[in-house]
């Protein structure tokens, strides 16, 4: 039939149940995981301590 697919049509187990390209929920979880990973990388590089230059001996 035409229209959105029903979740009962797909029988996924394991991680495929939450991350797949067949259901709207699965696609949403993939997008959220991608955006979350990118946000964590940005935060890591923004908040990590800055390296101070070594003291030069004169």
UniProtKB/Swiss-Prot annotation:
Keywords: Acetylation, Membrane, Mitochondrion, Transmembrane, Transmembrane helix. The modification N6-acetyllysine is found at residues 16-17. Subunit k, of the mitochondrial membrane ATP synthase complex (F(1)F(0) ATP synthase or Complex V) that produces ATP from ADP in the presence of a proton gradient across the membrane which is generated by electron transport complexes of the respiratory chain. ATP synthase complex consist of a soluble F(1) head domain - the catalytic core - and a membrane F(1) domain - the membrane proton channel. These two domains are linked by a central stalk rotating inside the F(1) region and a stationary peripheral stalk. It is found in: Mitochondrion membrane. The keyword Transmembrane applies. The chain crosses the membrane at residues 23-45. GO terms for cellular component: mitochondrial membrane; mitochondrion; proton-transporting ATP synthase complex. It comes from Rattus norvegicus (Rat). The gene is Atp5mk. Component of the ATP synthase complex composed at least of ATP5F1A/subunit alpha, ATP5F1B/subunit beta, ATP5MC1/subunit c (homooctomer), MT-ATP6/subunit a, MT-ATP8/subunit 8, ATP5ME/subunit e, ATP5MF/subunit f, ATP5MG/subunit g, ATP5MK/subunit k, ATP5MJ/subunit j, ATP5F1C/subunit gamma, ATP5F1D/subunit delta, ATP5F1E/subunit epsilon, ATP5PF/subunit F6, ATP5PB/subunit b, ATP5PD/subunit d, ATP5PO/subunit OSCP. This is ATP synthase F(0) complex subunit k, mitochondrial. Ubiquitous. Highly expressed in skeletal and cardiac muscle. Moderately expressed in brain, thymus, stomach and testis. Lowest expression levels were detected in lung, liver, kidney, adrenal gland, spleen, small intestine and adipose tissue. In streptozotocin-induced diabetes, the insulin-sensitive tissues skeletal and cardiac muscle were down-regulated. It is a single-pass membrane protein. InterPro entries: ATPMK.
